[in-house]
């Protein structure tokens, strides 16, 4: 090494100059990286922005709207005609319109919210609540546990329906926006005319909905909370950062990473191979869950999408004319001998051109596809494939798997993708079908079960819809909260009603049960209720009266039925009896007795006022004799003249066993009416926000009275209970006990004034006889369904 400092400096400078002359490798690497293309699924999506003022979505080259609809429970011809009219006269021609039916497994939040009033109490409450939640969560993740030998795909899902539409618009001009806003109003009004209620989907709801469609996690039951970023394009907000999509020949695989755990889902697509021979809108739901054959159901999450384009009327009319003239010409030559069907085809095209020419129909191109999601293993995928193909084939729909085209079909289930040019690709691939507008209206995936109420008794529907029963829910828009239940022994009546009683008690309300057979004794003990035998019941008709003007007629009716269960008292009898009731209460208030009523009647009979009225004196004598059995020294006096009635207002649950009174019908009806009046008075005297419930079990025995007064009494009580948040649940063995000429007036009144009617397993013989007598009461489908109901222990 040189000791000369100048030489060292010179060497360092030369090294720096040499380094500067070398090529810049880092710059070159950055250039190569810039030229590389990393595929991103979000770039395939056209979503960009949302205009809050207009409610429209501004996509890359299109502009559109999205609506969410409440699925309809069923359909009829008028609904189909309204939808057909919308297609023919309201939708712009040549622009795709999509209907999406989504079966979601993200029901965890709904289950927890719905069970909030069915929670356990006590030392082990937390443990039992966790067990209850886990039971339903496991059913949603897989399926409900069933008895050995019963293999039905019963699970929990939530069905949602969406409409999406977009049209080309690069500049997003004010004129385009106004035109689209008017179209939204027209479409929503048309759907409302078809009994389909809709609401607009905003940006937050959009990223939640599309995010669920795209990012399926088979291990998740809870929707992901997405925070809308107003400064980011919507397409990026719909796709998870860990999104990993792999395209296979026969399926797609979707990988995600959530909460430190990896998940992989398999995506399967199936589209319609050809037009079905026949289709009805009201039967479309049977394609994914058959009511009569529940084994033919699709239990995995799926999206059923119908993409349609109404073709230009002039072009299709010209096409029909040319086709008809060609076929009509061939039908008159020897060609028809070789192809006999040509005459039928000519006739069909001739009829079609007439309908097109008069505007009665339009030709619609459509693509029907179902996208299913399952765990990524071959065995599960094979089961899902067979379930889908068999379920649709049962109704005459032949589906095929789009080999090498699953990515294309998957994109069709997403909003606004068809309007970006995807529908054109489908037409070029030859997978688009054509049919008349009326036929396509029958293919719309709009029918699904109703979730009923947000909370209450968890009661899944036949089509696996997560549903709850809360008879007090005001959103049902029922005229009352009453329920009528009919089912044979072992049908599950008690198992249905006991949770409803629990829910009322858990909410702070009270329940009274008329029992015959100890069916509610165990529940009463578990809930800390009061169990009373009919033999030990003690009443006083005047005990709980606070306003005689309000209660006099009800007490009069009670005494009228007690005096004559067969209804032999007329208006004069009742007028005299009303005077006696009022006078007795005014004299002794709550200490009044039936003896005081009889004494008033005796004094009236001996009064000079009726000396010249033998008919009135005769009526007074009749009532004195009839009511004598209920006076303190009468046969049943011990039941109705107590200073301390058996029923106390502080009891939250009371079960009254009336089986011991069945062989004494006069006493039974008197006790029944005394109980109902007690319950009514308690309903009236308690806060209206408090739930009140009266269960009449074995109603066919307790309400079997031919007295029309009983029916009027029941009807009035059942009608007025709603104003005080009260409900009556009447239970019988057979529908004939409620709704037939043989039914008593009381039973018919209970049936007619019950908004909720629950029909369980019926006696096959009795139900067949009922259908012969009343053929219009049930549709054939309903008869078949009821006929297949089994015993509760076998479910």
Protein language model regions, located:
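Sensor-1/coupling segment of RecA-like P-loop NTPase cores
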Residues: 721-738
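Glycine-rich phosphate-binding loop of nucleotide-binding enzymes
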Residues: 55-62, 69-72, 83-91, 188, ...
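P-loop NTPase motor domains
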Residues: 82, 86-92, 296, 309, ...
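Short glycine-/polar-rich loops that comprise or flank the Walker A/P-loop
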Residues: 94-96, 508-509, 529, 651, ...
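Extended, folded cores of ATP/NTP-driven motor/assembly subunits in large transport
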Residues: 1-443
């Amino acid at each position: 090494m040189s000791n000369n400092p100048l030489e060292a400096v010179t060497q360092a400078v030369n090294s720096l100059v040499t380094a500067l002359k070398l090529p810049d490798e880092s710059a070159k690497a950055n250039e190569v990286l810039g030229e590389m293309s990393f595929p991103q699924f979000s770039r395939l999506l056209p979503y960009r922005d949302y205009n809050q003022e207009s409610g429209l979505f501004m996509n890359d080259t299109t502009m559109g709207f999205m609506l969410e609809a409440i699925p309809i429970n069923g359909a009829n011809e008028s609904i189909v005609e309204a939808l057909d009219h919308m297609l023919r006269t309201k939708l712009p021609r040549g622009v795709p319109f999509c209907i999406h039916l989504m079966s979601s497994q993200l029901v965890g939040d709904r289950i927890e919210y719905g069970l909030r009033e069915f929670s356990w109490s006590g030392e082990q409450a937390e443990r039992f609540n966790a067990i209850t939640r886990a039971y339903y969560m496991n059913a949603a993740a897989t399926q409900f546990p069933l008895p050995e030998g019963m293999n039905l795909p019963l699970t929990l899902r939530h069905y949602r329906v969406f409409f999406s539409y977009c049209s080309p618009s690069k500049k997003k001009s004010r004129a385009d926006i106004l035109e689209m806003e008017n179209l939204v109003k027209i479409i929503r009004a048309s759907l409302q005319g078809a009994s389909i209620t809709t609401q607009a989907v905003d940006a937050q709801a959009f990223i939640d909905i599309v995010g669920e469609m795209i990012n399926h996690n088979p291990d998740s039951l809870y929707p992901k909370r997405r925070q809308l970023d107003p400064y980011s394009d919507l397409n990026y907000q719909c796709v998870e950062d860990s999104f990993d999509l792999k395209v296979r020949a026969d399926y797609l695989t979707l990988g995600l990473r959530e909460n430190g755990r990896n998940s992989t889902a398999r995506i399967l697509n199936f589209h319609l191979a050809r037009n079905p021979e026949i289709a009805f809108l009201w039967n479309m739901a049977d394609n994914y869950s058959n009511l009569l054959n529940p084994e033919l159901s699709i239990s995995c999450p799926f999206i059923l999408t119908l993409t349609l384009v109404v073709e230009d009327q002039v072009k299709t009319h010209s096409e029909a004319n040319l086709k008809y003239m060609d076929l009509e010409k061939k039908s008159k030559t020897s060609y028809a001998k070789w192809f006999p069907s040509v005459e039928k085809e000519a006739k069909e095209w001739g009829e079609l051109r007439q309908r097109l020419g008069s505007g009665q129909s339009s030709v619609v191109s459509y693509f029907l596809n179902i996208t299913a999601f399952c765990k990524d293993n071959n065995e599960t995928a094979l089961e899902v494939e067979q379930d889908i193909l068999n379920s649709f084939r049962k109704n005459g729909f032949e589906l095929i798997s789009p080999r090498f085209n699953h990515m294309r079909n998957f994109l069709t289930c997403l909003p606004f993708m068809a309007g970006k040019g995807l529908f054109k690709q489908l037409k070029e691939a030859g997978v688009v079908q054509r049919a008349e507008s009326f036929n396509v209206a029958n293919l719309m995936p709009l029918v699904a079960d109703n979730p009923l109420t947000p909370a209450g008794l968890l009661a899944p529907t036949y089509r696996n819809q997560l549903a709850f029963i809360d008879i007090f829910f005001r959103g049902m828009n029922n005229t009352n909260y009453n329920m009528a239940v009919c089912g044979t022994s072992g049908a599950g009546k008690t198992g249905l009603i006991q949770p409803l009683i629990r829910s009322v008690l858990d909410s702070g309300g009270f329940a009274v049960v008329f029992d015959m057979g100890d069916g509610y004794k165990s529940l009463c003990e578990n809930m800390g209720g009061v169990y009373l035998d009919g033999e030990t019941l003690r009443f006083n008709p005047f005990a709980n009266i606070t306003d005689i003007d309000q209660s006099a007629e009800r007490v009069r009716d009670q005494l009228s039925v007690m005096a004559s269960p067969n209804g032999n008292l007329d208006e004069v009898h009742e007028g005299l009896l009303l005077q006696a009731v009022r006078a007795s209460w005014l004299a002794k208030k709550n200490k009044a007795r039936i003896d005081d009523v009889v004494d008033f009647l005796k004094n009236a009979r001996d009064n000079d006022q009726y000396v010249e009225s033998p008919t009135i004196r005769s009526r007074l004598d009749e009532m004195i004799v009839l009511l004598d059995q209920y006076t303190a020294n009468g046969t049943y006096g011990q039941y109705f003249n107590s200073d301390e009635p058996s029923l106390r207002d502080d009891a939250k649950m009371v079960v009254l066993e009336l089986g011991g009174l069945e062989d004494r019908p006069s006493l039974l009806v008197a006790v029944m009416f005394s109980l109902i009046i007690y319950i009514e008075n308690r309903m009236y005297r308690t806060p209206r926000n408090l739930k009140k419930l009266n269960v009449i079990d074995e109603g066919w025995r307790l309400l079997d009275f031919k007295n029309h007064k009983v029916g009027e009494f029941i009807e009035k009580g059942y009608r007025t209970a709603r104003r005080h948040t009260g409900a009556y649940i009447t239970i019988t063995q057979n529908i004939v006990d409620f709704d037939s000429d043989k039914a008593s007036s009381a039973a018919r009144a209970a049936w007619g004034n019950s908004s909720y009617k629950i029909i369980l397993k019926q006696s096959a013989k009795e139900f067949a006889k009922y259908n012969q007598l009343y053929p219009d009461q049930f549709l054939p489908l309903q008869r078949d369904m009821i006929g297949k109901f089994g015993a509760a222990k076998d479910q």
